[in-house]
Amino acid sequence: MKLMNSNKEIIMETGLKVSIYADGADIDTILKIKKNRYIKGFTTNPTLMRKAGINDYESFSKELLNNVTDLPVSLEVFADDLDEMLRQAKILASWGENVYVKIPVMNTLGVPTGPIIKKLSEEGVALNITAIMTSSQVSEVMSNLSIKTPSIISVFAGRIADTGIDPVPVMKECLFRMKGHPKSKL
């Protein structure tokens, strides 16, 4: 209950909303979850798809998009190279108006993806920036996002909590750093 009160305080202080997105790779489960009014969108990634036995990323994604037309659906690039991420992002974005392209805040070598975030955002590609662990990463992301382009900022509060850090103050700081970006959601 304390966490819920803290979230309400955060929302009241910042004017921003915290949204819940269901993460998965099973169409039947997604369709059941879609009926829950608290779910504001869906997200998946290549790892979840692989674990679910999905071999055709494009076919699965397009089936998902055919079934979920009224909520955001985040589809993740699977490349680690920044140029290839950019190429894949443009393809994913072309699959539907409700697609948010998931870009990790950095690649596996620790190279920030800010330049691609900036380019895609300026081109109007809706983005879901993922694997964020710190408020300073949020600041870096926000400096690269166009205020005109919708975005989802995916801070991994659960993983922050797993390190023994209370995620509520971190989330509050992240929301604060998102001010001035009315089309960005946490």
Regions found by a protein language model. Name each.
Residues 111, 118, 125-186:
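Catalytic alpha/beta core domains of metabolic enzymes, predominantly
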